Amino acid sequence: MAKAKFERTKPHVNIGTIGHVDHGKTTLTAAITKYFGEFKAYDQIDGAPEERARGITISTAHVEYESENRHYAHVDCPGHADYVKNMITGAAQMDGAILVVNAADGPMPQTREHILLGRQVGIPYMVVYLNKVDQVDDPELLELVEMEVRELLSSYDYPGDDIPIVKGSALAALEGRDAEIGENSIRELMKAVDDYIPTPERAVDLPFLMPIEDVFSISGRGTVVTGRVERGAVNVGDELEIVGIRPTKKTTCTGVEMFRKLLDRGEAGDNIGALLRGVERDGVERGQVLAKPGSVTPHTEFEAEAYILTKEEGGRHTPFFANYRPQFYFRTTDVTGTVKLPEGTEMVMPGDNLKFEVELIAPIAMEEKLRFAIREGGRTVGAGVVSKILK
């Protein structure tokens, strides 16, 4: 059978299921595909293949489905460690998440951890599915659990009072019984996701930014920098800034090339060469970014959420301590930095995830949600995301 082609006419949104182990994330994912996509059985989702992101192996299942209004790409991870790695590396960017909570248990440790991670890595919106409601006989108990979930969300700066909470049974939906808590709850959930999680801005509509990968000098023309446009678009004649590592410098783009052809513009996703006016060959280097003036600023100190690889994943064999000095790989280059551990943390073991502060020896064009790798001599030993800029 030929693969059905998804019509790209609908706006696209990336979401995923998060929550405590065994609260029903994968069952819910399977149930959604039953009513809105190409049906995937529990085992097909649970046996997620391993993939690599920033040198880290993660198991993630990807499913696609569509509501009346939108097309969704949905991620589900088999294990808790996979969630942590996935959220920190941004291997699967999420525009919003469905938090699954077992109504009989209420919020559990990983429920809390996933909400905290969501806040740290910048998942902007959450919708709650209160699962297994058929295991709770007392409606007052159900109300208490709902209140508890709302308070927990609010304590991590999510608007707990406004977040939609849908009650149901993913298993009933998957087995096609008890429509009230089964199929109807899935339809209600997707309506909540449609209405509450906004369509993200397209990358091409954001301010222009291109990490510089290489620099060439073309005799008689000037200096060309190459790279893949991360977001936005650049037109010939645009004023730009070169940001990071050295003092910020203004320039003008006098030409855009792609595959040796001259273009009027380059946009998100394109690999381009940009010809820059008045910039010497040694006045710009890999690791800087080319950006719309004022849209991004250079920083040296930030707070990060990071995951440290285990020995089995090719990471360190030993813990590290305060004032650890690895390299931080941002976009296209390594910059050395010093780690400041949170109070009460003496050492960090391989396999840990934690929040810490970093001071870099040179400024990098940076904003919240920017991902990086932690490296020692070119070997990846961890992954992180900027959760807050300090200086």
Swiss-Prot record:
Keywords: Cytoplasm, Elongation factor, GTP-binding, Hydrolase, Magnesium, Metal-binding, Nucleotide-binding, Protein biosynthesis. GO terms for cellular component: cytosol. Residues 10-201 form the tr-type G domain. Transmembrane segments: none annotated. One of its GO terms (molecular function) is GTPase activity. Residues 19-26 are annotated as: G1. The keyword Zinc does not apply. Residues 55-59 are annotated as: G2. Its EC number is 3.6.5.3. GTP binds at residues 19-26, 76-80, 131-134. Residues 131-134 are annotated as: G4. It is found in: Cytoplasm. It catalyses: GTP + H2O = GDP + phosphate + H(+). Mg(2+) binds at residue 26. Residues 169-171 are annotated as: G5. Residues 76-79 are annotated as: G3. Belongs to the TRAFAC class translation factor GTPase superfamily. Classic translation factor GTPase family. EF-Tu/EF-1A subfamily. GTP hydrolase that promotes the GTP-dependent binding of aminoacyl-tRNA to the A-site of ribosomes during protein biosynthesis. NCBIfam families: EF-Tu, PRK00049.1, PRK12735.1, PRK12736.1, small_GTP. Monomer. HAMAP family: EF_Tu_B (MF_00118_B). This is Elongation factor Tu.
